[in-house]
UniProtKB/Swiss-Prot annotation:
Any one of the GO BP annotations: coenzyme A biosynthetic process
Domain DPCK: 4-200
SUPFAM superfamilies with a match to the protein in the record: P-loop containing nucleoside triphosphate hydrolases (SSF52540)
Binding-site residues, ATP: 12-17
Protein name: Dephospho-CoA kinase
EC nos: 2.7.1.24
Role noted for this protein: Catalyzes the phosphorylation of the 3'-hydroxyl group of dephosphocoenzyme A to form coenzyme A.
Record's catalysed reaction(s): 3'-dephospho-CoA + ATP = ADP + CoA + H(+)
Gene3D superfamilies: P-loop containing nucleotide triphosphate hydrolases (3.40.50.300)
Length: 200
């Protein structure tokens, strides 16, 4: 059995940047966001269960999930957010475990799991080590407002729906500081790969 490394962060700390750098280094990575889309595609039982709970208004005209509308609903309503997680998380977990098995069977020794809500979903047991991509809360807020064209209040609502980034950093085996330049972030990623991936 190979090693599984969890990659997480918060809503605008730059986890996607780090994820891309890992994949560019040729290391297999299973993305929970991609898995989450797969398990609620048109025709899946995951989507059917979401429609049963949230209603048909949650669908676009072509019968696919209206992600923007669902996002608005769950960011404002904790109970509905928890219900969505209850529907999707077990399916996402199964998808990711199957992908990991495929990589290990192909001879890979290390697989990354990119999981935005790793701690919130209590998935620490799936991985051997955890990397957290960190920025200051101020940088996180600024980036989210700019990236998603949100007001400060809207951005804070999204950030506050997750565990705080400083709390996540305390739980990590390795923290990547993504508060400054891409070059500095790249160096940290390469250092991690050298220490924990190549030095198996």
């Amino acid at each position: 059995m190979g090693k599984t490394i969890g990659l997480t962060g918060s809503v605008a700390t730059g986890k996607s940047t780090v994820s891309n750098l890992i994949q560019q280094a040729g290391i297999p990575l299973v993305d929970a966001d991609i898995a989450a889309r797969k398990v609620v595609e048109k025709g899946t039982d995951g989507l059917a269960e979401i429609v049963a709970y949230f209603g048909k208004d949650i669908l676009l005209e072509d019968g696919t999930l209206n992600r923007a509308k669902l996002g608005e609903i769950i960011f404002q309503d904790k109970e509905k957010r928890e219900k969505l997680n209850e529907i999707t998380h077990p399916r996402v977990k199964d998808y990711m475990l199957n992908e990991r098995e495929r990589f290990f069977e192909a001879g890979e020794k290390v697989v990354f799991f990119d999981i935005p809500l790793l701690f919130e979903s209590h998935l620490e047991s799936l991985v051997d080590q955890i990397i957290v991509v960190w920025t200051t809360p101020e940088t996180e807020l600024k980036r989210l407002m700019e990236r998603n064209n949100l007001t400060k209040e809207e951005a804070l609502a999204r950030i506050n729906s997750q565990m705080g980034i400083d709390e996540k950093a305390k739980k990590a085996d390795f923290v990547i500081d993504n508060n400054e330049s891409l070059e500095k972030t790249q160096k940290q990623v390469l250092t991690f790969i050298e220490r924990f991936v190549n030095n198996k």
